[in-house]
Amino acid sequence: MDAKMFDTICSRDAISWLPDEVLGKILSLIPTKQAVSTSLLAKKWRTIFRLVDHLELDDSFSLQAVKDQTPGLRKHVRFVFTEDFKIFVDRTLALQCDYPIKNFSLKCHVSKYDERQKACVGRWISNVVGRGVFELDLRMKDPGIHFLPPHLVASKTLVKLTLGTQLCLGQLPSYVSLPSLKSLFIDTIVFYDIEDLCCVLLAGCPVLEELSVHHHDFIATPHTISSPTLKRLSVDYHCPDDVDSASHMSFDLPKLVYLEYSHCALGEYWQINLESLVEAKLDLGLERKVLRMDVTDLIIGIRNVQSLHLSPDSVHVIYSYCRHGLPVFKNLVNLSFGSKNKRGWRLLANLLKQSTKLETLIVKDLNGYTGDVSMPLNKVTSLHILGYRGTADEVKQLKSFIGEFECLELVQVDVAEAAEDNGKILQSKRDLMMLLGVSLPSKCQFKVT
């Protein structure tokens, strides 16, 4: 609903008969800038705006260019929020008085040297924290040191917090206490002390269950994640300039059940405590500055998983740099696997050997598979092939690959979108049904999607 339509409805008195609480909910569903504009219609709407419990403030409509005056560095232009944006935010918060708020989102560009702008941001955050905010999304771009207001790290009501992006935080207070926080998303944050994430921030979150740590093209990548309560973790690092042979990673997370980890392979994994892990998704790449990669301890640390997802890059890394061999995956029943070459299929054979309970195998592509890589005896009952393109070589590969599994009850082949026109897809399906249908056990279902 745009502002003009909303103003038209209001001017016709089409909804003013609704209860104020309902009108407040309606205003919460439209962009904050338009919701604020309704306060100009009549005194009644100024009162109703106080009931809006969801605010999204973004300075993208009001930026000004300033020159970076950092001594010794090449001068370049940065963008920061304008005085008009400051007035708009101050007015918006003032209109609401001290009414409770549930969700607050602030996206702004802060001047590196303007302490007045930094103070404004701190005041805005303290305002909504003082009103009992539940969910807080702060995306602040500040090339200088930015200190979080004390009220933020002592909130009793905050349940979900997002902090970013490319932000250098000043020293955190030692009294961080977020007793209700269950979800934390950190996007490219540099902490004043490298241990502040683990030893100060996470230590002050006694009921935290979900954590996402993303770090892209920036310095000071967090290398230790520890929490006695965490259940879900997503780590996405892409910082080639911040990695070398001394880089390491540590996960001390005894209650973690879900891990998504995207990073380059490192030389050391100091402490991997993931005893409760149920599902893991690994995307491990190569970095030339890491001279001796070894992912053995990481792979041993995830050995209790029931579901494992390996990207093609991860398969290559594990085959080449799990230097002390694969552990036994005693609980593994679901495996999603991608390979780029013959080495990857050899790793699959080793995984089948070490995973005697495996029932479901998802193969992302048959690229590189040859019949001379034989699979050990296994109990796989469900085989799912992704990315089938309908080539003659793939039919041969698929027929050979299926022959390695004697206990199959279901084979499903997904045709890739690249197998362009419908005629080709239909032909591929008919070919597969004819060529493979007769070679499958009678109890096995065969599907092409």
UniProtKB/Swiss-Prot annotation:
Residue spans of the LRR repeats: 161-188, 191-215, 216-237, 239-263, 287-312, 340-365
Matching PROSITE patterns: FBOX (PS50181)
Keyword Transport (UniProt): no
UniProt keywords, alphabetically: Leucine-rich repeat, Repeat
Gene3D superfamilies membership: Ribonuclease Inhibitor
Keyword Ribonucleoprotein set for record: no
Limits of the F-box domain: 12-64
Listed Pfam families: F-box, LRR_At5g56370
Protein name: F-box/LRR-repeat protein At3g60040
Source organism of this protein record: Arabidopsis thaliana
Lineage, broadest ranks: Eukaryota, Viridiplantae, Streptophyta, Embryophyta, Tracheophyta
